[in-house]
Amino acid sequence: MITGLSIHNQINKKNEPVKKEQNIQAFVRVRPFSVYELNQGVTTVPIRVSDSSKEVLCEYKGTTRQYKFDHVFDQDSIQSEVFNIAVKPICDEVLLGFNGTIFVYGQTGTGKTHTMEGKHGSNEDMGIIPRTINYLFQCLEQSGADYNIRASHLEIYKEEIFDLLACNGNENLNKPLGMFDTQKGFKIPELEEIVVNDRQSILNVLAKSCKRRQTAETQYNKQSSRSHCIFSITVHVKETSVGGEDLIKIGKLNLVDLAGSENAEKSGNNDRLREAALINKSLLTLGKVITDLTNNEKHIPYRSSQLTKILQDSLGGKTKTSIIATVSPSLVNLEETINTLEYALKAKNIKNTPQINQRMSKNSLLKEQSSEIAHLKQLLQAAYDKNGVYLTIDVYEQMKRELEEKCSQQSITEHKMEAQRHEISSMRKSFDEQTMLFEEAMNELESSKKQQQEKQKFIDQFISQDTMLRSNLGSAVQDLSKLHEKLDTMKSTERENQKSIIDSKSILSKRLTDLNQMLVSKLQMGQNELLESLSVQLKVVHDQQTKSNQLIGKRINNLSQLIDSSVLQIQQLNNDDKQQTQPLLKLNKESNDLFMKLDKTIQQLSDQIKIILSDFSLPFFNSNNNNSNNGDEIIDDSLINNCFKLINDHVNKSDLIVSQQNKLIQEFSESMSQWMLHQSQYIIEQRDYQKQLKEKQILNNTQWEKKLLSKLGQVIQQFSKNFTDSTSVYYDTMDNNLQHFEKQFNSINNHSRQQVESLSNNLQQSSTLSHQFESTVKSVLNDHHANNKKVDPKLIESIEKAKKRINQLTDGCIDLSQRQRQCTNQFNEAFTDFTFGIQSQKDILDRVIIEKNQVHEILPLIEKSKSTFKENIDTLIHSLDSRKSIIQSSTNECSNQLNSLISSIPSYLDSAIKVTSKSGETPSKKHFDIPSPISTSSSSSSSSSISSIHSNAGGKENNHQSINNSIKSNNFDGSKSINCDNMKIDTPQKSSTIPITPKSLKLNLNSTPKSVSKNLKSSQQQQPLIVPSSNQLTLSAKKLSNKEYQRLQQQQQQQQQEQQQQQSAKKKKLAIEKQLMITTSPTLSLVNESPFSSPKLSKQKILQDQIQPPQPPSILSQLNSTPISFLQPQQPQQQPPSFFNNLNGSFNRGNNSIDFSLLDDDSDSDNSDDDVRSLLSSNKKSSRASKNAVVSKKVGLTPSRKLKGVNSSANQSLNVKKSKPILTSLSKKQNISTPIIHSSKPSIFGGGSTISSKLKSLKQQTPLK
């Protein structure tokens, strides 16, 4: 039977693609500079984006790092560009049925939330989430398929999960959600998932949920998100299969806004610091997961953080993932930027295997949902039946099984814990035992170290004492011999010095006097030259100043001429003004006369009219009282009255106009006269002032020329002050006068214009009034003529007469008005001429102003010349004073020094000559005879004696001791070897012993007796030599007090007691040492001093020993008394120290010298065993043929210690170095190889063992340090 499930599985198998691994896509976005960074002027960008937009170049600590990503968004990138390149492909994959995840990671304040959310409400600044929602809805709507979109929004704050889409109740708002591990992964059952139908509703839900997110203000950002935020979108799309069955395609997209990684120092205090710690913890676990995935680790710590639990499938799972890293361009955040880039680069290397989600049929979904509903109903029914929480049987049995499994696991773990406890207890016991043993070993080691340190200190003391004694002895002998030679030379040199000093006194005095005279003459010459040069300079300055004064004088003369010409022009203008004002005055008089005549005619006319009227009215009124009407009388009266009023008004107005014109003309004439007077006075004053200035200038010039040579600086200052004052006063007065003149000119011009305008207005008014009067008179006459046609003929005649008279008067008035017009025209012409004259005066004033400006231009030139002159003179005076003071001081110093030198030379020479006073205490030369050592040729003797010379101040006591006595008296151990050529003694310290094979012993002998030459010949035949010592040793002694003598004796007694104690300790070890001792008959004898060999010391001997402090007896006697033999060291920790470890000195016996040198440790040590074997074999052969043999001692090498040799003279040197074993030989100015004869008795080493095998065993037992 074909079911929907089988069809669904077949479709999924067909559509299931081949599993391919894909890397996580990594993008980088660089934010632009913030407002705060721009205000601070930050411009340097350590990050650069390549042209291909796939690489980031970062300059860090002098190197350029390069990071490659899938795409890099620069500072100018916009939100739509980021969405189209980074997010849109994953959205398309989600619609096809894949799961996708997009991370946004970066430092706090780099724009993660802006990239993910953007600004709500603006189309340009929308983030990834709203653009994704719009794009999904757009694609689904265009496809026309049935779809369902669900959204959830959660945040992880302080490792707790909170639902941002929960209801607004207080209980659920702050309640953290739980996460459970299931077979399908980690799930959050209480997380609310909202079904969304349109884009606007989901955007509104998103805006509300974003507001609930945890934010705070930090040093990076004012509103920084303090939690991880995950916005999940689940898309269900319905499809129909070929068989007509409905299938559902599911895709899920997680948009993750991670909290910002930040430095703890920049996070702030208290809460912000704790939040940053938790944020960094979760990001650290995410980084561990990323690194483990890139390294292909077996275990990946997904469970370490809530974030990695939720996003487990996105990292190395079946989803398509991309990460967007946001970085800052600021140089301050460079380290965080580099960490972010490396973080993203690691994430890019993670490989996912994206798989498409299985398409589910409608029936299967319904079955799953129905089973879940039934399960939930069972739980509800169980809960409703009884109080409390009840479960179904299936759930109870399942829980019971889980409990049993957990109990069994717990028992197993308890058994394991018990076993581990037993193991831990046993381990503790063993550990305690080992610690006890370790402590005991450490204590023993510390005690042994202390003993070793004490012994090493003791050895170092002896070595230092020995080196000091040897070096001081050699140097003292040399110094004493050289002192006497120096004394002899000093006496001769003193005599010569006295002679040379006496000669040098006279020569020096002569030369110094000559030098003094030469210096004085040179100084005088220099002074004269300086004075001449200064005089020349002063002349040059004087010439320059005279030239500048002449130029200034010329300019001033030109200005004075210009001023004179301007004054003449002003006078001419005054005369012209007077001439022009005279016709104006005449016009004024004529106008006054005309107005007077006019007044008279008007008065006459009025009188005549009155007479006529009186004559006319009396008969008229008397004869016709009855016949006349009231209306006619009223008309006549009114006519007459109007006529009189008009005449009176005209007369009054004409009088006013005339009076006003008279006043204006008088005022104008007065003002012009005053102005002319003022101008004339001003011109006179300017002339006088100019004359005074000229006189002052002449006086100043004469005074300046007279006093220039005597007091140059003072005269210049006074002249400059006077000149500046006079010029400033002159120019100030000129400025004031010109300003006053301009003001007066402007006021006169304005006043004259006003007067002319008023005159013209008055004339117009008078002309209009005359015309009005004529017209009124004519109208009145016409009216009278019309009204009085019926009057008597007498009246008519009188009226006609009156008419004639009136006509005459009117004609006269008309004539007067015409004349008045002529006068006004003449006045206007005169005024225009006057105005032209004033304009010409204005031109003259402009010229005067130009001259004033020229004068102002001259002033800075004068000041410049004055300042330069002042500077030149000041510099000259300063240079004169300085040079004068320098010359005087130098001459005084030179003369004083020369005089002091001349006076101090004889006293200095007298004091410098030191005459050596004879004290009588200088020691004289003393010769000490050093006898040659006793040589023994018998082979049966165990050791040859070495004679030691003990010399005192008198040279009376000479004590000789043999080698055997010196061996008995010295505390010498068998663990030391003496190399006679190089005087090398090695003290083993916990190390294996290697025999010393002498290579070279060089003796430079100036005088060798016959026995020595014989021995040298025999030494060439491989025979041992005896060192001769027949010359003398020179010593010097000092006197000692009794107290010092007693103290030295006490010290010597103490040393003898210590020596006895050491000898008693050594007797216990003699049995062991005798078994290893190899004795042969021949020995090498050396001659040396042993001052502590004899028990009795004389006072002179103690005086001799005061040269060096007393030392233990093992210092020199060990060299003389130690037998040269092979000794096996027993118990090296208890061996006494040797003073030969750091040997540095020389032995001198007259002209004979012994050179001691050791080879360096840098030579090859690998062939030491072979060298020893070859030398031993050669020594066995040579011992059979030789009569005298040198027996060496087998010792162990101590750690390398290098010392520089001290060469006291050419023939006396002792160079000591730590080295490999060497061969010893004696020669006179050449190297002679002397073999060493070893005893080949097997009984000494026990069991017939050879020397080489014993040496090997010793090497294996105690290796070299």
Swiss-Prot record:
It comes from the Eukaryota. Pfam families: Kinesin. GO terms for cellular component: cytoplasm; mitotic spindle; nucleus; spindle microtubule. The keyword Cytoplasm applies. Residues 918-1026, 1085-1119, 1127-1146, 1158-1214, 1245-1265 are annotated as: Disordered. Residues 1158-1169 have a biased composition (Acidic residues). Residues 23-350 form the Kinesin motor domain. One of its GO terms (molecular function) is ATP binding. Residues 930-951, 1100-1119, 1128-1146, 1174-1195 have a biased composition (Low complexity). SUPFAM superfamilies: P-loop containing nucleoside triphosphate hydrolases (SSF52540). PANTHER family: KINESIN FAMILY MEMBER 11, KINESIN-LIKE PROTEIN KIF11. This is Kinesin-related protein 13. The lineage of its organism: Eukaryota, Amoebozoa, Evosea, Eumycetozoa, Dictyostelia.
